């Protein structure tokens, strides 16, 4: 995510991502008492792997090294506003869960056909919280035991942040994290298309998912047009 060259100590391999472009911003967020050496990205993720090793030096088959949040920024925000919003979100995550967050903002790859408004961020969270010594401690269980509730909490938090920053930017646009059903709306939700379907779209190739989504969008457009006529 960070477009860096990282060395995996566990397997002695070098992972070179320096050819990746479009990283607008990157930062590691951690509790204030965290050992300073964990603010280095390579050290951090090597320590994460080390915490999941078996006695024979191999990573446990069931090991989960990180959790990931992916967020999309409102197109009305500029670079400084996106960074400020990410700062606030990651600080909230760190405060609530006591973990480290490794976050990167990516600019859209317009050369490959990506929507120029698609500024987004990847936030990798350690699955272990920081203990009293400032090092990786126990596994966080809340995402396992209360996954749905935690996801809903952060969706709501993100929507609140979006709307506050949109207001500060002087925009009248607002977002709502709730489903159309929860909002009492008759609009239909589309299905997430993913990178493969998106790439095929750019090539002019239809898929079952893209065709269904296009039909949903058309029906939604008709409903919105009807509502405008009724008003």
PLM ranges: what are they?
Residues 1-231:
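N-terminal nicking endonuclease/strand-transfer module with a His-rich metal-binding environment
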